């Protein structure tokens, strides 16, 4: 008789263990939630974006309003306020995502510009800096009153008229 009791205890233990394992395997499922605390609303409604340091006006308004209807049927004014707050939260999230997009584009633009300047500096290191050459040439022409290199074609004079010379 003692053996049968032990066997039953072992079966019960196995059942409890399997239930616990099932619970452990369900860790990804959401726990059934009661009414949320008023501070939790901001985090829950915008889980995709991290909570900003300074709470926005909308978050402050929601905290002031408190959690959803728990004991009573809300009045029309209460429902309207809640609707407006939801709408502002949606707009706020859209705005934040837009800001993120602009920041991302600015970052990419900065990277491209840095790449361009890196290549320019590399070219300058390889071939030397000729950016001031045109100014130097013009200064020489002004000083001496003649073109420094008449072989270079200007838009005004073509080689055609000098061909027979």
UniProtKB/Swiss-Prot annotation:
Subcellular compartments: Host nucleus, Host nucleolus; Host cytoplasm
GO MF annotations, alphabetized: RNA binding; structural molecule activity
Coiled-coil residues: 1-26
GO biological process: mRNA transport
UniProt KW keywords: Coiled coil, Host cytoplasm, Host nucleus, mRNA transport, RNA-binding, Transport
InterPro entries: EIAV_Rev (IPR021311), Gp90_EIAV (IPR001361)
Extent of Basic and acidic residues compositional bias: 1-32
Motif position, Nuclear export signal: 32-55
Region (RNA-binding (RRE)): 57-130, 144-165
Function description: Escorts unspliced or incompletely spliced viral pre-mRNAs (late transcripts) out of the nucleus of infected cells. These pre-mRNAs carry two recognition sequences that function as Rev responsive element (RRE), that are not present in fully spliced viral mRNAs (early transcripts). This function is essential since most viral proteins are translated from unspliced or partially spliced pre-mRNAs which cannot exit the nucleus by the pathway used by fully processed cellular mRNAs.
Name listed for the protein in its UniProt record: Protein Rev
């Amino acid at each position: 008789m003692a053996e049968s009791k032990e066997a039953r205890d072992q079966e019960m233990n196995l059942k409890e263990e399997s239930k616990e394992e099932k619970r452990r395997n369900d860790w990804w499922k959401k726990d059934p939630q009661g009414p949320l605390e008023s501070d939790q609303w901001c985090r829950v409604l915008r889980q995709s974006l991290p909570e900003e340091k300074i709470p926005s006006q909308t978050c402050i308004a929601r905290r002031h309003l408190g959690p959803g209807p728990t004991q009573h049927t809300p009045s029309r004014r209460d429902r309207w306020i809640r609707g407006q707050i939801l709408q502002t939260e949606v707009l706020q999230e859209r705005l934040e995502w837009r800001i993120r997009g602009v920041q991302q584009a600015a970052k990419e633009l900065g990277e491209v510009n840095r790449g361009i300047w890196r290549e320019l500096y590399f070219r300058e290191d390889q071939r030397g800096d000729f950016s001031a050459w045109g100014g130097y040439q013009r200064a020489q022409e002004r000083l001496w009153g003649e073109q420094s290199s008449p072989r270079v074609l200007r838009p005004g004079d073509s080689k055609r008229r000098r061909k027979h010379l």
